[in-house]
């Protein structure tokens, strides 16, 4: 998989305008920290499947090890290098009405893996129209300078055309969505339900 951005800009405006009912569902306190909880489950876990209906068709085909799930708690990078992790995280973002962030990030990864110049130009225009241009259906939250830079690069797009925008969205997910994901019902059930099944068996 192509490289993932980690460097943090000096400033980044985070999205906070979520519906009240969605924010209420995200606030759940657990008795033990997630990393310790998952490690305590390690002897009992054999495989873990996604409990989310939107991603179950992907994850149920691929058995996960407890160590893989624990890796997801270490960093957003480790979560996104896993196809199963991407599917579960995407389901969570969909529940928060911010699925466009992971869709854009994945589109950029695919874009950077494209070698044919005509195909690159075509994909650049699709990404711009879907995520970057004003009033786009899945418009992402990037600043004016970054948006303007992408627009200019469309005349002669390169593999680096969306680098700045992708970096901003990665950091937004890392700071805003990822910490909530680790405390979410989706992630909690992913681990807890199978843990319970093994304990009963």
Curated annotation (Swiss-Prot):
GO molecular function, one term: GTPase activator activity
Keywords: Cell membrane, Cytoplasm, GTPase activation, Membrane, Signal transduction inhibitor
Protein name: Regulator of G-protein signaling 1
Keyword Membrane: yes
Domain RGS per the UniProt entry, residue ranges: 75-191
Membrane topology: Peripheral membrane protein
Pfam families per record: RGS
Annotated Gene Ontology cellular component terms: cytoplasmic side of plasma membrane; cytosol
Entry-linked PANTHER family: REGULATOR OF G PROTEIN SIGNALING, REGULATOR OF G-PROTEIN SIGNALING 1
Main location per the UniProt record: membrane
Record localization: Cell membrane; Cytoplasm, Cytosol
Function: Regulates G protein-coupled receptor signaling cascades, including signaling downstream of the N-formylpeptide chemoattractant receptors and leukotriene receptors. Inhibits B cell chemotaxis. Inhibits signal transduction by increasing the GTPase activity of G protein alpha subunits, thereby driving them into their inactive GDP-bound form.
One of the GO BP terms on file: positive regulation of GTPase activity
């Amino acid at each position: 998989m192509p490289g993932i951005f980690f460097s943090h800009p000096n400033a980044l405006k985070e999205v906070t305008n979520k519906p009240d009912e969605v924010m209420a569902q995200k606030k759940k306190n657990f008795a033990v920290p997630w990393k310790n909880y998952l490690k305590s489950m390690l002897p009992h876990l054999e495989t873990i499947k996604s409990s989310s209906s939107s991603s179950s068709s992907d994850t149920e085909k691929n058995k996960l090890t407890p160590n893989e799930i624990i890796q997801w708690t270490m960093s957003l990078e480790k979560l996104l290098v896993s196809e199963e992790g991407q599917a579960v995280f995407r389901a969570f973002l969909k529940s928060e009405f911010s699925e466009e962030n992971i869709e854009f990030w994945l589109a950029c990864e695919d874009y950077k893996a494209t070698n044919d110049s005509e195909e690159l130009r075509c994909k650049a225009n699709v990404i711009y129209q879907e995520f970057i241009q004003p009033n786009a259906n899945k418009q992402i939250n990037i600043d004016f300078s970054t948006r303007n830079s992408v627009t200019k690069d469309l005349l002669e797009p390169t593999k680096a055309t969306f680098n700045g925008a992708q970096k901003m969205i990665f950091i937004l997910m890392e700071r805003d969505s990822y910490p909530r994901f680790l405390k979410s019902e989706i992630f909690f059930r992913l681990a807890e339900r199978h843990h319970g099944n093994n304990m009963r068996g």
